[in-house]
């Protein structure tokens, strides 16, 4: 069932629905029922946001399609979003925040509107969090945090500043991946994600009595992103190949 919406607001940038997941996921085979699901419908995009606890964090990615894969992306968007959020929940097991994930699927031929779509995605979610005019009143506080992902890393500062302008109480923490001047920590500079992954690799090597310098490996993902580039810098294995779709 729908628990909140900005449908009746007269200044909405997109229509957002907050949905009780137990009302429709209970009969399906999912590993766990999320805490909340948002569905956001914009002129040029369809968006979702799934979180597994009231306080959760995870990235939001913009999905850009070509003529060949748009239908597939549209049909699998929610399932992919759910899987990403559940995976983020597992990743966040050792920190106070649970996991969440968001996706913004651009409609066919509308990839050039991606930045605007992300802004509208944030704006419509804020309508519900801030109980904008036309949004049903609720005694329960709604808290949303976002992070960078595919095609959104450059938008974190703007999102942080925007929710500040809308007087969101948690604006400083609203996005990760923002610039230092807004309180962000450059995780790529410190290799934060890579160092976490390396613990699994090194733990496996210890368990199997393998010496790091004697191991060979093939990297998929490549040096273009912060994870692959820092993996190359931090590791001592012999790299025999790198596959990077971005070139």
Model-flagged regions — what are they?
Residues 1-187:
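N-terminal ligand-binding/catalytic initiation module
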